[in-house]
Swiss-Prot record:
Protein's name according to its UniProt entry: Acylphosphatase
UniProt keyword terms in alphabetical order: Hydrolase
Gene Ontology molecular function terms on file: acylphosphatase activity
Residue stretches making up the Acylphosphatase-like domain: 12-98
Active site: 27, 45
EC supergroup of this enzyme: hydrolase
InterPro entries: Acylphosphatase, Acylphosphatase-like_dom, Acylphosphatase-like_dom_sf, Acylphosphatase_CS
PANTHER family tied to this protein: ACYLPHOSPHATASE
Keyword Protease: no
Membership in a protein family: Belongs to the acylphosphatase family.
Record flagged with keyword Hydrolase: yes
Taxonomic superkingdom: Bacteria
Length: 98
């Protein structure tokens, strides 16, 4: 399989997570989960108390990450997860907390 064919299989999603998701280790746990799933991108807190993330990787792994984000770490109380696919040229090198 060529490099271009491999690149075409990589998906990128923008995600927003709402609820009690700040001050409960959500970003740190998200980084750990993303590393375990070999995903790339980032996660960050927003001023409105929600968390946003850009997740990049194979579709099956992204599906697993989205399922995990619906509950997050034990102290989190997730009330809503929204996501949309983004078409970006950039390929992230790793998954990190911002």
């Amino acid at each position: 399989m060529s490099r271009n064919e491999l690149d075409e299989r990589i998906e990128t999603y923008y995600v927003r997570v709402r609820g009690v998701v700040q001050g409960v280790g959500f970003r740190h746990a998200t980084v750990r989960e993303a590393h375990a799933l070999k995903l790339r991108g980032w996660v960050a807190n927003l001023e409105d108390g929600s968390v946003e993330a850009m997740i990049q990787g194979p579709g099956a792994q992204i599906d697993r990450m989205l399922a995990w984000l619906r509950h997050g770490p034990p102290a989190a109380r997730v009330t809503e997860v929204t996501f949309e696919e983004r078409h970006v040229e950039r390929r992230f090198e790793r998954f990190q907390q911002q």
